């Protein structure tokens, strides 16, 4: 526990005092101006909170404490954290008062929240979290309470949903328990634990352009299913479906894009790799990764290094190969909650949470008005949609849905009737006190070929520049296709399916 920082329990986290600024005054909330939005779009000084965690957690029984593995990790990303610290110190705060502080818990009142030490670094892992058998929840979410050293509240950030399991399934898994199986294209963590000792746990991780076994940080890797005939190459074609033992896979770091060579995933029984197992891979299973087209070489760790280990054939059992402890990896699915915000009009009185997250866009048209529907989470009535530096008329529906009127292209381009190039603008959400919540989505006004008819809305194509896979089907409304506003239909496009190692 750091000196001068109070011990927090879940029942107390809402009671952190708000410290006023100079002479006891805090600035009144200000609506965002176009000039402030232009400055933001130019500088992009976002503050981002990332919560990385496993999708499942093993329950602890009696007095035992099965700590979550890999440990949940909180990252503070973006240049905004440094800028916020500098701004607070310019306003008279000490270095300790401008330091972000964080506590993490499992969202129940019985267990104390644990402090995360963020001093001097942008990440921290919570190594001693567990869930006991007295907690009857089948799912839960991690809760991260953040504030500055001067007690200014940042907010409470939630992880994605985590499933509670009793122990790894030893039965031959079937696809009936799909939530315990691992699908192609999802993210996993891999860790190795020698002689079942927690202190010896090491995680597959990429740092400095190399794969290594880290005791401090873990990596999230896309696991892609390949055709057995797929050759080694920087680009490869991926398959859908659940991962089964005996199949060819590719592991790609979700942060750097670095990939390992083609691997065949094999089931581990004691200190042997089973060559003929073909059941679905399940959460917290032990598995081995054979480097395809090699002489019994397996992915293995030696201290912090990742090496190739040559297995030994079992003389009496041709369907097994003997491996050492360093080639046995535990596999688990991972998830990520990401929250991005920026104080567009300077310091605010309230927490930045709940942070809205936009998951998809849908264009609807009728008459002279084009409407954009936003689907996501944590929407509130005090949010407005902005297209670039233009505020749109916004209608709140519920916490998962909002509507807005697409601004006329003339708001962005004078002489728009002669524009022949597409005009692309970012879509953001802005709270009524000036907090900007960026999305990874953009809206593109696409000009029509030939003479322009006079209409109040230009043709539009939505481009979702996010990791979300969206439909390529044209959007239609009750009156038919979108051609009553433009001769262009509206399509949502996604990034390419090719994965580059």
From Swiss-Prot:
Region described as DNA-binding: 58-68, 166-171, 193-198
Residue ranges constituting the IPT/TIG domain according to the UniProt record: 356-446
Compartmental location: Nucleus; Cytoplasm
Keywords from the named record: Activator, Cytoplasm, Developmental protein, DNA-binding, Notch signaling pathway, Nucleus, Repeat, Repressor, Transcription, Transcription regulation
One GO MF term attached to the UniProt entry: DNA-binding transcription activator activity, RNA polymerase II-specific
Biological processes per GO annotation: Notch signaling pathway; positive regulation of transcription by RNA polymerase II; positive regulation of transcription of Notch receptor target
Domain of life: Eukaryota
Main location, first listed in the record: nucleus
GO cellular component: cytoplasm; MAML1-RBP-Jkappa- ICN1 complex; nucleus
Annotated family: Belongs to the Su(H) family.
Subunit structure: Interacts with activated Notch proteins. Forms a ternary complex with nrarp and the intracellular domain (NICD) of notch1. Interacts with rita1, leading to nuclear export, prevent the interaction between rbpj and NICD product and subsequent down-regulation of the Notch signaling pathway.
Function: Transcriptional regulator that plays a central role in Notch signaling, a signaling pathway involved in cell-cell communication that regulates a broad spectrum of cell-fate determinations. Acts as a transcriptional repressor when it is not associated with Notch proteins. When associated with some NICD product of Notch proteins (Notch intracellular domain), it acts as a transcriptional activator that activates transcription of Notch target genes. Required for the transcriptional activation of ESR1, suggesting that it is required during primary neurogenesis in embryos.
Entry protein name: Suppressor of hairless protein homolog
Organism annotation: Xenopus laevis (African clawed frog)
């Amino acid at each position: 526990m750091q000196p001068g920082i109070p011990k927090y329990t879940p029942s107390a986290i809402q009671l952190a005092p708000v410290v006023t600024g100079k002479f006891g005054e805090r600035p009144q909330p200000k609506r965002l101006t176009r000039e402030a939005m232009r400055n933001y779009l130019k500088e992009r000084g976002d503050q981002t909170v990332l919560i990385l965690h496993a999708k499942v957690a093993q329950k602890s029984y009696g007095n035992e404490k099965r700590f979550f593995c890999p440990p949940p990790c909180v990252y503070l990303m973006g240049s905004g954290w440094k800028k916020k610290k500098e701004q607070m110190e310019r306003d008279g705060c000490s270095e300790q008062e401008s330091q972000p502080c964080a506590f993490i818990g499992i969202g129940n009142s019985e267990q104390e929240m644990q402090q995360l030490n963020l001093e001097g670094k942008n990440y921290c892992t919570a190594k001693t979290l567990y869930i006991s058998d007295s907690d009857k929840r089948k799912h839960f979410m991690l809760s991260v309470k953040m504030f500055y050293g001067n007690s200014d509240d940042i907010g409470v950030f939630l992880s994605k949903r985590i499933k509670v399991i009793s122990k790894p399934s030893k039965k031959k898994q079937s696809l009936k328990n799909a939530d315990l199986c691992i699908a192609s294209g999802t993210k996993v963590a891999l860790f190795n634990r020698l002689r079942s000792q927690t202190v010896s746990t090491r995680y597959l991780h990429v740092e400095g352009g190399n794969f290594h076994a880290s005791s401090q940080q873990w990596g999230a890797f896309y696991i892609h299913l390949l055709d057995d005939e797929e050759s080694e190459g920087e680009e490869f074609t991926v398959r859908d479906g659940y991962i089964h033992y005996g199949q060819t896979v590719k592991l790609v770091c979700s942060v750097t894009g670095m990939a390992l060579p083609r691997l065949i995933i094999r089931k581990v029984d004691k200190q042997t790799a089973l060559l003929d197992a073909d059941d679905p891979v399940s959460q917290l299973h032990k598995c081995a990764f054979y480097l395809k087209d090699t002489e019994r070489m397996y992915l293995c760790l030696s201290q912090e290094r990742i090496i190739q280990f040559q297995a030994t054939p079992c003389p009496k059992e041709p369907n097994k190969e003997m491996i050492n402890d360093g080639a046995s990896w535990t596999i688990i699915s991972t998830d990520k909650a990401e929250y991005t915000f920026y104080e567009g009009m300077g310091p605010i009185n309230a927490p930045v949470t709940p942070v809205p997250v936009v998951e998809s866009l849908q264009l609807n048209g009728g008459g002279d008005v084009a409407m954009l529907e936003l689907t996501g989470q944590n929407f509130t009535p005090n949010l407005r949609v902005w297209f670039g530096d233009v505020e749109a008329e916004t209608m709140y529906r519920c916490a998962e849905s909002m509507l807005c009127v697409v601004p006329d292209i003339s708001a962005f381009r004078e002489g728009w009737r002669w524009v022949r190039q597409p005009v692309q603008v970012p879509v953001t959400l802005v709270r009524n006190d000036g907090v900007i919540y960026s999305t990874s989505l953009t809206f593109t006004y696409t000009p029509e070929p030939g003479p322009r008819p006079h209409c109040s809305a230009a043709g539009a194509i939505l481009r979702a520049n996010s990791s979300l896979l969206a439909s390529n089907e044209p959007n239609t409304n009750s009156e038919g296709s979108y051609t009553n506003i433009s001769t262009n239909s509206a399509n949502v496009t996604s990034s390419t399916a090719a994965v580059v190692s």
